[in-house]
Amino acid sequence: MNPLKIYLGLALVCWGLASCSEPTPEQLFAQAEAAAADTTSLDKAVNQFNSFLERYPQDKLAPRALDKLALIAQKQGDMKGAVVLYERLLSQYPQSDQVDEAQFMIAFICEEFLGDLEKARQAYQRVIDQYPTSELALSARHLLPNVGRPPEEWVRFQDAPRAP
């Protein structure tokens, strides 16, 4: 048998196997993000983000995957599920860039959708205490004393300028 044919055959087999390799973390995350952008494929996005987290739990994109899953849960009306996902993000990735937002969203969802005012107060206080330099800490400072009150009682709008 011709050694060149053997070499070319092996090269083709190796190339074929390489093209069937597992997607990179970035590729899998991008596929999930694309699915999440289409409201008709949210279940597909959930499966892809969960697959990403199973395969790459220590990847730098893992906290963002949990954040995206929480956002999808909110879109689907599963507010308790969203809180669970945000809590998971806080416990598994406490050093990530998403923690202040996750803590804030727990507070917001607990107040606005679940009616758990005590948990909302605690979550807003954690934003203030644990992330004092976050832009969301300023919002939490404003919202905390008003938890449970209707906005019309505490939101002050500037009077519209009056024509002379």
Model-derived segments and spans:
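Acidic, polar-rich low-complexity tracts and alpha-helical solenoid repeat scaffolds
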Residues: 3-4, 16-164
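Sec-dependent N-terminal signal peptides
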Residues: 7-14
